[in-house]
Swiss-Prot record:
One Pfam family from the record: ClpB_D2-small
Gene3D superfamilies reported in the protein's UniProt record: 1.10.8.60, P-loop containing nucleotide triphosphate hydrolases (3.40.50.300)
Keywords: ATP-binding, Chaperone, Cytoplasm, Nucleotide-binding
Protein name in UniProt: ATP-dependent protease ATPase subunit HslU
Organism of origin: Rhodopseudomonas palustris (strain ATCC BAA-98 / CGA009)
Length: 433
């Protein structure tokens, strides 16, 4: 768990996301509160529950992007799921407890990666010995091995093909246990029940360079204590886990509607104990969910937050509204973030030896077109910029391989020539932009 201050978290999010200060502050405080709770002693630590967040705002304003960037910052088990993917228990499909099972798998992968680094040096030595066995045979003399070891470390043997034995992948037969639908426990693998069946291996022919990472990871895994790894992962989920529930407005039951709404309300009811705190059984052990932070988000352009079950509303106490994007926001999105759209396209064209030069008035024109189409057709926020950029740079992208060494200047006239008429014609915009 990282110990960034809320100010540091917000400034980190500012590098990639324009505006939405309220949402950034809310997630920054929530993340810091996770760290604060872990500093408490004894029974008080158990009593401090996370304040779950509901982010409300139109599509394309940064809700999902905030969650994505937060995941990288948190250094904690993080899972993003769409609420629409789940069904009520008893219906065909995945039930909400699968969220926690998936989160545990994420945590195990995270902890394993971290622990591999701790045993990296020993794993490198063991992997090197296996490569030497493949090159000169296990019974070769010390002088021969030393000679090949020097060549191996110098990179002279990187392109040489060797045959190595590696762990077979998870190709175990899968089946469902009668009376326990796969939706509830996930498909059961015979490998999970009978272990790895004596550690099945298969022979593969690879270059020395390609085999290096595979062998180092295998040797590192042999040095790890799997039981301890799983226990650490479960503890990380229980104390630091974060779940981002997207599209929560799509499971709202709207007044005067019936039919499929039953299942939607059922999903909300199933989410209640998960968010409030329950114990979920996974194949790795029981997981308590009391201290997992849930961040729900939705556009709520048809439904309202008040259409959620009252109990679910109560379990999402912090409300944050994200604002629709203005023309100025669109302009900033094109230029300010570290991986802004313009920087991406300039870098892509550079691979062809072509220089792209955007004038200030071109950036203004791109923002104007995006705002105009959003206001007349359908407001999809910043995602509209991608459509407009692709349309504007269509010709340049097509001819770039034949124009090596040339410079293309994109100005306001160039933008208007390519998309200006489409933006004005609402009927065409509907289909093209």
């Amino acid at each position: 768990m990282t110990d960034f201050s809320p100010r540091e978290i917000v400034s980190e999010l500012d590098r990639f996301i324009v505006g939405q200060a309220d949402a950034k502050r809310a997630v920054a405080i929530a993340l810091r509160n996770r760290w604060r709770r872990l500093q408490l002693e004894g029974s008080l630590r158990e009593e401090v529950l996370p304040k779950n967040i509901l982010m409300i705002g139109p599509t394309g304003v940064g809700k999902t992007e905030i969650a994505r960037r937060l995941a990288k910052l948190a250094g904690a088990p993080f899972l993003k799921v769409e609420a629409t993917k789940f069904t009520e228990v008893g219906y065909v499909g995945r039930d909400v407890e699968q969220i926690i099972r998936d989160l545990v798998e994420v945590a195990i992968a995270q902890v394993r990666e971290k622990k591999r680094k701790d045993v990296q040096a020993r794993a490198q030595v063991a992997a090197e010995e296996r490569v030497l066995d493949a090159l000169v045979g296990p019974g070769s003399g010390p002088a021969t091995r030393d000679s090949f070891r020097k060549k191996l470390r110098a990179g002279e043997l990187n392109d040489k093909e060797i045959e190595i034995e590696t762990q077979a992948g998870s190709g175990s037969p899968m089946f469902e246990i009668p009376g326990m639908p796969g939706a509830q426990i996930g498909a059961v693998s015979l490998g999970d029940i009978f272990g790895k069946m004596g550690g099945r291996t298969k022979k593969r022919r690879l270059t020395v360079a390609d085999s290096h990472e595979i062998l180092v990871n295998e040797e590192a895994d042999k040095l790890l204590d799997t039981d301890q790894l799983v226990q650490e992962a479960i503890a990380a989920v229980e104390n630091n886990g974060i779940v981002f529930l997207d599209e929560i407005d799509k499971i709202c039951v709207r007044d005067g509607r019936s039919g499929g709404e039953v299942s939607r309300e059922g999903v909300q009811r199933d989410l209640l104990p998960l968010i409030e705190g329950t114990t979920v059984s996974t194949k790795h052990g029981a997981v308590k969910t009391e201290h997992i932070l849930f961040i729900a988000s939705g556009a709520f352009h048809i439904a309202k937050p008040s259409d959620l079950l009252p109990e679910l509303q109560g379990r999402l106490p912090i409300r944050v509204e994200l604002n629709a994007l203005s023309r100025d926001d669109m302009r900033r999105i094109l230029t300010e973030p570290e991986a802004s759209l313009i920087k991406q396209y300039v870098a892509l064209m550079k691979t062809e030896g072509v220089t792209l030069d955007f004038s200030d008035d071109a950036i203004d024109a791109l923002a104007d077109v995006a705002v105009a189409v959003n206001s007349t057709v359908e407001n999809i926020g910043a995602r509209r910029l991608q459509t407009v950029m692709e349309r504007v740079l269509d010709e340049i992208s097509f001819v770039a391989p034949d124009r090596h060494g040339e410079t293309f200047r994109v100005d306001a006239d160039y933008v208007k020539t390519n998309v200006g008429d489409l933006a004005k014609n609402t009927d065409l915009s509907r289909f093209i932009l």
